[in-house]
């Protein structure tokens, strides 16, 4: 080979090597410019709008729960299971439902529409609440008193069609949702016999009322603030706010005469509601009552009403369910405890339960280490550790208070009459919880979820949540998926809301002044950090609304990263964990869906959840050799951490 040829050959080799290096750098740059996108883009690209990894798991869980319902229907052994079968048969008997029509509802609608003044209407509205469990004048929930631990009555904003606050009613992104509900109400009224013009006028009248009420109610962010919605007053104080309703008569008629102390969640909304409870607005109240009766019960009557309901679901959820599918969904809603018990027996193995228990305890131990080396002063650290060590762990909880199981379906009654009677039983039984410490599970086990309950200081890992585990022996993959989820929920014990409650789940200011000031500093930094992310171009993430969930995300990632460190994990282990974390939150949402989510969800959008957390994680930088040239890079002084 000549000297010139040798030089040319060497040059080609150099060019080739440089090209390989450049290609590697390019690929590596994509890898860390948007970690969420890099990990998930191949999965997402062929998915339909609205798809998510979690939805796929929930569909699998739902199918499993449906199969359990089928097994119960085919071979019921207990009285509760026989009720499930009776409900199913009645729901599918569309011939009898069509024949019965609205006979069981027309009586109530007629009585409401015959009232001639607001006092007569109030009398009928109270009867309506007693008979149909429809709350027109006051919405009530039974929850724990944050200071005593006993169940009390919370007076909450009255239910509206699509939200409680102006955040929903004034936002243009929700126009399609609002129009769908208006069309739904319009069709219900037309089917009942109103003319097109009458139905249009009534729909607009009700929408105008809700819009004004929402504009005079707490903002969405306020409804998430303990100080805003925990407002203990007595009945006499409520009487001074809601002057057009005889409060004593109202509570006495409902069998709640012993109630004195209660929590008024949104005083402003009831001040506004009071202005409407006059003779001048009698027609409005009649129309609200009519539409509420139809919304609540008409789907259990004729095929035409059922079709109106299923078409609304198709517009809102993107799927039109068959009658049989709807029956299974209703069974899961009405009998959550029965389905949960059977679901747990079939899908929660002892091995999985033990694995989750051990992992949860490992996470709790790591939180203790993090707390003991944190910015808290010694007094606050001691109380934080006490709270941590008193967290109750519930796996496959299945302790829903299933009041509906106490009602025996009567085959001689119509489906809608049975549902009316069942709702009365449920309402009466729920009132019996007042002034007790009875606890109920918020979610059935056939749900992909875990949650921290601040009033019982418990971490609740639903059986459906374990579906994310593919192999209990794959420690690092599980650490990034179910491990992160558990660590996230435990972190809620110390977020902006959870930190206000002690180890017994009672409202208590256990932070010293200096620790509280430092924590507020950290919260402000987290808010600013997440405000800097955009959901879509020119639409910023709301760091204030998402503060609690962002704190939980950051704390969870610190926790599982520390576990990796203590397990002497290698680079591949870190990559496995971080990739697993990113995959769980994969979704394919449209721009409008992302904006809508930001209005109603306290979590940051999933892409921000992944990239925001990892961009503040030092070990992530080391694992992927991220530097200032990469878009995932955040200057060290601008990164946020909760405990370190």
Residue ranges and their predicted role:
Residues 64, 68-363:
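Noncatalytic, helix-rich "gating/capping" subdomain that lines the substrate-entry/channel surface
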Residues 21-34:
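Membrane-interface motif at the C-terminal end of an N-terminal transmembrane signal
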Residues 38-39, 156-158, 462-464:
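Active-site-proximal beta-strand/loop segments in catalytic clefts of secreted hydrolases
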Residues 48-71, 196-214, 478-485, 573, ...:
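Short secondary-structure subsegments characteristic of cysteine-rich extracellular domains
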Residues 206, 341-644:
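Intrinsically disordered, low-complexity linker/terminal regions across diverse proteins
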Residues 2-16:
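N-terminal Sec-pathway targeting helices
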Residues 36, 42-46:
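Primarily extracytoplasmic ectodomains and periplasmic/lumenal surface modules that are beta-strand-rich
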Residues 45-50, 57, 164-166, 217, ...:
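Short, solvent-exposed loop/turn and secondary-structure capping segments
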